[in-house]
Regions:
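Class I SAM-dependent methyltransferase SAM/SAH-binding core
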Residues: 52-110
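N-terminal, positively charged/glycine-rich alpha-helical extensions of SAM-dependent methyltransferases
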Residues: 1-21, 182
Length: 241
């Protein structure tokens, strides 16, 4: 995850309490959908046959490892949480991919890489935690070479009224309790935080506004796929030559 504004320092502290059981509980609490969403994200990155990939908000390196397994690329993963990166490095070592994957501490809003340094960029669950999503998208695109592919994944609010009502009930009532039972107080806090955070983000940044931000950053042919009745969304596009 990547957090940049003072308003979201709460989120930084919140997620720093989660690394040890993050991957298991993320799958359980998303009914196994997180893995499907990640696979869709990786498909668009791998299809570009990149040699250098940047994975932003890499967390425990799940996406970075999946990209390395699906391509011949060298993957650089960045995150603001040293606790998550520590787990990620152990996972990379366990997968015997230390020569293929490098993990660093960095913020999505100010990447320590040159213009056009990467052939492809992936990012997950980032834009809800930055003060200016459009500026962050532009910063990501800056490090992408012309013709390179960028793909992002995040939660979404289901567009159909029945699915949205079920989603609202789950995120406001079921998710906090399930988190408490399975992961303790830290996951109770996350469960209470996520639903309102997701809803608030898309009130400020509806899909049309996000698409405009991608295009303003020089990404063309932007497409998206709503998944799991709209509970998740994957977006992708190519940097204008």
């Amino acid at each position: 995850m990547a957090v940049g504004s003072a308003d979201n320092e709460f989120a930084v502290k919140l997620f720093r309490r989660l690394p040890r059981r993050y991957d298991l509980l993320a799958e359980v609490l998303s009914f196994g959908q997180n893995a499907r969403w990640r696979a869709e994200l990786v498909k668009h990155v791998a299809g570009a046959e990149p040699l250098q990939v940047l994975d932003v908000a890499t967390g425990t390196a799940g996406v970075a490892i999946a990209i390395a397994r699906s391509t011949d690329a060298h993957v650089t993963g960045v995150d603001v949480s040293e606790e998550m990166l520590e787990i990620g490095r152990a996972r990379v070592a366990g997968a015997a991919m230390q020569t293929r994957i490098e993990l660093k501490s960095a913020r999505a809003e100010a990447l320590p890489f040159g213009d056009g340094a990467f052939d492809a960029i992936s990012f997950t669950y980032v834009l809800r935690y930055v003060s200016d999503p459009a500026a962050t998208i532009a910063e990501l695109a800056r490090t992408l070479r012309p013709g390179g592919v960028m793909a992002g994944l995040d939660f979404y609010v289901p567009p159909s009224p029945p699915a949205r009502a079920a989603w609202w009930l789950y995120t406001r009532a079921v998710l906090p309790v399930a988190g408490l039972v399975l992961g303790g107080r830290a996951w109770w806090d996350v469960g209470r935080f996520l639903g309102p955070n997701i809803s608030g983000h898309y009130r400020r940044w509806p899909l049309a506004r996000l698409l405009d931000a991608w295009e303003a950053a020089g990404i063309e042919g932007v497409e998206y796929r709503q998944m799991s009745l709209g509970g998740g969304i994957v977006m992708w596009g190519t940097k204008r030559a």
